[in-house]
């Protein structure tokens, strides 16, 4: 995982009016907290931060008054209509420190031939990983799975140094028979019974 370097400026003005002024300057108000330190209020360059946040669990290297600090996004607030960043909460991390994060579950391969549906019971997995080696996602094969099959959290291969932070027996994916096919079979069965009578 690569880190994104951002120049941060300390923020002394607070409140709705100050936040609006900051956003008008194409910057985003943010707060950095963690490790028992007092929260630090900063502003970040809006466009660079928006690009960085496209990567899930991005590691940010913040330059705050000449001091470099590592942080990961904890909460991101966006405008509901226009989608611009309103505020970001960042959690301080250290190299080598373990953190709990959610990673996306991707699938590869095809289900067995037939009309089957793949249900994503969980679209993300909570894992514990080193702050500087957080995986963007995990991938699991669904090749040849048929109706009734399920994939549990423990069945998903994780990168080295990453462990599950949820129940290992949690169902992540399951294969279902298509409803239309079942309805057609039931209708055909009912028609056969009706014709025999």
UniProtKB/Swiss-Prot annotation:
Task: Name the Pfam families on file.
Answer: Ribosomal_L25p, Ribosomal_TL5_C
Keyword Signal belongs to the record: no
The question of whether Zinc-finger is a record keyword is answered with no
Q: Name one GO cellular component term.
A: cytosolic large ribosomal subunit
What GO terms in the biological process aspect are recorded for it? translation
Keywords per UniProt: Ribonucleoprotein, Ribosomal protein, RNA-binding, rRNA-binding
Instruction: Name one molecular function that GO assigns to this entry.
Output: structural constituent of ribosome
Please describe the quaternary structure of this protein.
Part of the 50S ribosomal subunit; part of the 5S rRNA/L5/L18/L25 subcomplex. Contacts the 5S rRNA. Binds to the 5S rRNA independently of L5 and L18.
- Which family does this protein fall into? Belongs to the bacterial ribosomal protein bL25 family. CTC subfamily.
Briefly state the protein's biological role: This is one of the proteins that binds to the 5S RNA in the ribosome where it forms part of the central protuberance.
Query: What name does the UniProt record give this protein?
Result: Large ribosomal subunit protein bL25
Query: Origin organism of this chain?
Result: Streptomyces avermitilis (strain ATCC 31267 / DSM 46492 / JCM 5070 / NBRC 14893 / NCIMB 12804 / NRRL 8165 / MA-4680)
């Amino acid at each position: 995982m690569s880190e994104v370097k951002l120049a941060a400026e300390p923020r002394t003005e607070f409140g709705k009016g100050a936040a609006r002024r900051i956003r008008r300057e194409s910057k985003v108000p943010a707060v950095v907290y963690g490790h028992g330190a007092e929260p630090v209020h900063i502003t970040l360059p809006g466009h660079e931060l928006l690009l960085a946040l496209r990567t899930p669990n991005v590691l940010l290297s913040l330059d705050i008054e000449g001091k470099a600090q590592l942080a990961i996004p904890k909460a991101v607030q966006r405008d509901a209509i226009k989608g611009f960043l309103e505020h970001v909460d960042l959690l301080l991390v250290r190299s080598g420190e373990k953190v709990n994060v959610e990673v996306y579950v991707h699938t590869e391969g095809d289900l067995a031939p037939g009309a089957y549906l793949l249900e994503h019971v969980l679209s993300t997995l909570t894992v514990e990983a080193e702050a500087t080696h957080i995986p963007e996602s995990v991938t699991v094969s669904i090749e040849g799975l048929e109706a009734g099959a399920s994939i549990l959290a423990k069945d998903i291969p994780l990168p080295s140094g990453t462990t599950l932070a949820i129940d290992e027996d949690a169902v992540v994916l399951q294969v279902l028979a298509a409803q239309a096919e079942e309805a057609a079979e039931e209708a055909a069965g009912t028609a056969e019974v009706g014709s025999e009578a």
